Design a protein with these regions (language model features):
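N-terminal accessory/interface modules of nucleic-acid-binding and processing proteins
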Residues: 1-191
C-alpha cells in the first residue's frame, strides 16, 4: 500500500510502497486452479481419463480377478461392471500410475514394480481426496528400501513422486476443464 512520497535522484516525485504480500514466481506460474474441496466422482474420473494415452473398457471379469486392470499389450484399462465409485476411482488411479510408469520407464512388471506404482497411486489418491481402502503396500517399505544407500532411496522416492505428479497434473487439467465448462454453462443460463 502507498506509504508517502519521495524525490528520486532525477528530481521526479515517486510513491513509496509498504509491501504487504510477497509472492514467489512459482506460486503465480500455475495457469489453472481446481476447486478440490468437494470433487464429485464424475469430476475425478473425468480428470483421470483426460487426454489419456490409453482407452478404457468395461468387462464382466478382468484378468487375475482384479476389478481394474491395465493391459500394456492392448493399451487398455479394463474395469469390472458394477463396481462402487470409490473402488473404481482407486483402481483407476492405480492403473493410470502403471500407465505412467510404463511411459517413463518402459515395460511394466506388475510384481516387481508394484510397490513403486502403488505408492504413487496412494499419493495421487490423497491429492484427489479419493478414499484408499488397500494400503498393504506400506508393509513392503522396509523390504523395498533394504540395502539401498541414501542416494538410491532418494532417487526411488523421487521416481514415485514423479509418477504421481504426472498423473495428478493431467487429472487436475481435466478437472479444471470440466469445472470451467460447467461454470461457463451456468453463466450462459443466467444471462
Amino acid at each position: 500500500e502507498p506509504k508517502g512520497e519521495y524525490q528520486g535522484n532525477d528530481g521526479v516525485i515517486r510513491t513509496n510502497y509498504d509491501v504487504k504480500y510477497v509472492f514467489d514466481i512459482s506460486q503465480l506460474n500455475r495457469p489453472y486452479r481446481i476447486k478440490k474441496q468437494n470433487l464429485s466422482v464424475r469430476e475425478i474420473i473425468s480428470g483421470l481419463v483426460y487426454q489419456s494415452p490409453v482407452k478404457m473398457q468395461m468387462v464382466d471379469n478382468t484378468e487375475n480377478g482384479s476389478l481394474v486392470q491395465y493391459s500394456p499389450d492392448n493399451q487398455m484399462i479394463y474395469y469390472a461392471d458394477g463396481m462402487s465409485p470409490t473402488d473404481l476411482m482407486e483402481g483407476l488411479a492405480r492403473e493410470y500410475c502403471y500407465v505412467e510408469f510404463e511411459s517413463q520407464y518402459g515395460n511394466v512388471d506388475r510384481t516387481e514394480d508394484a510397490f513403486m506404482v502403488k505408492s504413487a497411486a496412494y499419493i495421487l489418491c490423497k491429492k484427489l481426496n479419493i478414499p484408499v481402502s488397500n494400503v498393504d503396500f506400506a508393509n513392503e517399505v522396509k523390504n523395498y528400501f533394504e540395502g539401498m544407500d541414501s542416494r538410491d532411496t532418494k532417487e526411488e522416492l523421487s521416481n514415485i513422486k514423479s509418477i504421481a505428479d504426472e498423473v495428478s497434473n493431467r487429472a487436475e487439467r481435466g478437472i479444471y476443464r470440466l469445472q470451467q465448462e460447467r461454470d461457463n454453462a451456468n453463466r450462459g443460463e443466467e444471462r
